[in-house]
Amino acid sequence: VGLTASMLTAAEPAAAGTPETWTSTFQGSDGVTYSATNHLVAPAGGPGRQWMLVWSGPAKQPAPDFLTVIDATPDSPTYGKVANTVTVGPNNGNEPHHMQYVWHKGDRIYAGGIMGDTTFVFDAKALPALTIAGVNTAADTPCGTLPDAYQVLGDGTAYGTYMGGPNVTGPCTYTNGQVRVGNGAAGSPGEIVRIGKDGRTLAEIPAATEAGEDPAQCGNVPALPAATCANPHGIAVREDLNVMVASDFAEARNFMTPDSALKENLARQTVRVFDITKRDDPVLKSVSKVADGPRGAQEPRAFFRESRVVMETALTNRPGHKGAFVSSMAGGAVFYTPDITAPAPQWKEVFDDTTAYRTFQGDRQITGSGDNGSWLAVSPDDRFLFHTVMGQSVPYGKPLEQTTGMVYVLDIQKLLAAGNGAKCSVDELAEASRGGRERDCPELVSTVPIRDVSSGGPHWGAMDNFKRGADGVYRETTQVSRIAVANYFVAGSFGGGGDHRVCMFDLDRRGRVTLDRSFRDENTGKPCVGFNRASWPHGDYGDAQPHGVLFVVSDGVVRR
């Protein structure tokens, strides 16, 4: 296994208007040589600056998957313009999904291809250029498939959630010698994988309990000898607490098409907490469950009750806080526990997406039910909770204007200040649309509709955790002033495709969000960068599907 970089155009400068291209390669454990080819254009020049990485795939095959590098420096003359596209090869059709939630100086980029069962690792020291530094292939993770989300640790390695079951049906042995029986790729149980900076598998970690879980709640198709809800999607880590949290999504292969039957017992309600004292051998400490709220009793289809499809989790950050949040994709609700280190965390619903809808949508038939809540993040200073909602409301048929997507911000300071004595609980029907009545309930600070009436909406997002000083140097900040979201989920899924825009939002000190209209598409001149375009620096491949987004900074102008 090794890395090789070759300058393909070093002999002579690129012609005017022609991207400068160069390729780095990496030989995977499977013997395949993987490549990353940069296509640098004019906005890539000049001094170091801030960038946005967008991990995307083509809308039509065959065409390469690629990382887009966009100028994210507001006062730059090329703000919002594509500076580079980094195509990966030789395999296409990976279905680019998530990168890590937050980037820190020196971190490598972990980018997952959920359908290709591959994690690509990139070195970002030469931004806006990237070099391939590692690849984790399907053969490297025999006990899990569908790589989803990543958290990078202080040593530069990463934990990744692999939502689907083993490559092959039957028993699978994890790194620590434990064995679980699975029903195959994209099935159950999923796992956690610790990945090295070179893409190597450091540890495959079982997410399922050995004894199994409630078979009535944890359906598996086909059934397993020990039923499991272990289909981890979201992941959050507090190294100071030696804790890792993963939220369970669904047995994914049963929901690959828009007309898939929405079976209640395949919609997960569970959250898994691991002790990561031994980084290569985390111990599953608890499996807890979120419960339906007051709106659920009125929803005839259990799949759309508040507790269903627990897609995302987010941890608080400050030393005095141990709280954790999770959100449900099909249920449209946010839940909280004040102490994630407790032996058996107790979750309470603290916010219903219906309340956010009421700020701009008067139709009282529209609720959080089926609204496809997605990205969830706590600001580094523990003041705000950010949440995106795709807005495709399946119970109401086609995605229409009234079920538009949105991004909203909650002030969570009172809730966290209450500690273990937190009282907030959305348990009355009126609270679903007005917010919790307890004094420590989160306060809805801001809601911005994101009008996407295609088959999807705003799914993933990222916080800008950097601030530029008067000396031109960037340093990390706890006060987030910008967030970005991407309007795309997964091709062919019940969540839909979205309109393929990436939008930037400004955040004031009170947490109020406004669309950054200066972050414009270089072709249309409209706010948000559109990924529906005929040409890219790497060729005329047409529309692309942006999923993961991440703020990064040129190595020479960022300090820890």
Where are these regions (language model features)?
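Beta-propeller domains
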Residues: 224-421
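Structural signature of eukaryotic scaffold interfaces centered on beta-propeller domains
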Residues: 19-48, 95-106, 146-155, 164-165, ...
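Short loop/turn segments immediately following beta-strands, especially the blade-tip
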Residues: 69-78, 121-131, 194-202, 262, ...
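Asp-box/WD-like beta-propeller blade repeats and closely related beta-sheet repeat scaffolds
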Residues: 124-239, 247-260, 269, 295-304
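Loop/turn-rich, solvent-exposed surfaces of beta-rich toroidal or solenoidal domains
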Residues: 324, 366-503
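Blade-loop segments of beta-propeller domains
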Residues: 79-153
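Surface-exposed loop and turn segments in beta-propeller and other repeat-based domains
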Residues: 81-96, 134-143, 200-230, 283-308, ...
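Short, conserved, GDST-rich strand-edge loop motifs in beta-rich repeat architectures
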Residues: 47-61, 160-187, 246-268, 387-404, ...
